Amino acid sequence: MKILVTGSAGMLGSALCPTLARRGHKVIATDLNTIDAGIEYLDVRGYEQVDDLVKKIKPDMVMHLAAETDVDKCELEPDHAFQTNSIGTQNVTLACQKQNIVMVYISTIGVFYGDQFEPYSEFDNPNPINIYGRSKLEGEKIVQSLLQRYYIVRAGWMMGGGPKRDKKFIGKIINQIKEKTILKAVHDKIGSPTYTVDFSKCLTNLIETGYYGLYHCTNEGYCSRFDVAKKIIDFMGRPDVTVEPVNSAYFPLPAARARSEMSRNYKLKLLGKDAMRNWEDALKEYIDSCWK
């Protein structure tokens, strides 16, 4: 297939585009950031720009990764969050609708409130706790209301990108242990890590099935940030570093976080398409391949 990808320069895009290419798909990579070779400029917030590019490329599929994923920035700048995550998604969706193109929308387990004790599945009702989750959920609703052929795939705590792109928890912890021997990490929020490489492989398999719909795709198992930090220290071979568990109140942040973002890939399992491994094995591979 000829696949146009938005947000290609980010954590996920840097793993997904090569995965698609290795499977024989022709990838047209786009992003606001064109520092990497082979990436075409695209700001999804501008409808005419999106529509013109889709008409010009005539892809078989558009994979929409472009998003504002900084949860606190979304809370502090809600107009920016909705303009990027909701209106940007509407622009891509309308362009796909006009050309009858299949669309893939990457969403988040953060669309749930986080108060249930069982892992969330595709059949649970969303109720976002923060602006980021609301803006992504609005994107889901737009895709579902305007298209018949789509994949909406929710990811969990994303890990990947290496030193160049990983500005999230894992990258921060690895950078901290270069300077500190005592760290603190939150233990009262639980989630499902999602390795970009594994997610990309699973997504590539899914889009070749024609099983359109809404899916969860996270690595197997659940953990707290504290659990992740302990594993990072172990995998980095730093027995001299210790991490102390703290409550989330220790780190006051603008945006509320869900108590639980535990996810299960229920529909993928029912379809026999869930090949996501344990999060600890995925984390070890990520650290060994990108941080050592």
Predicted stretch roles:
Residues 224-230, 247-291:
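Conserved C-terminal active-site "lid" loop/helix of NAD(P)H-dependent oxidoreductases
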Residues 44-84:
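NAD(P)H-binding glycine-rich loop region in Rossmannoid oxidoreductase-like domains
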Residues 186, 202, 209-254, 259:
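Mid/C-terminal beta-alpha module of Rossmann-like enzyme folds, strongest
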Residues 141-191, 197-198, 204-205:
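NAD(P)-dependent short-chain dehydrogenase/reductase
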Residues 32-48:
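Rossmann-fold cofactor-recognition segment
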Residues 76, 83, 87-91, 98, ...:
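Catalytic helix-loop patch of NAD(P)-dependent Rossmann-fold dehydrogenases
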Residues 6, 30, 62-66, 103-109, ...:
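SDR active-site strand-loop-helix element
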Residues 3-23:
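N-terminal Rossmann NAD(P)H-binding glycine-rich loop of SDR-like oxidoreductase domains
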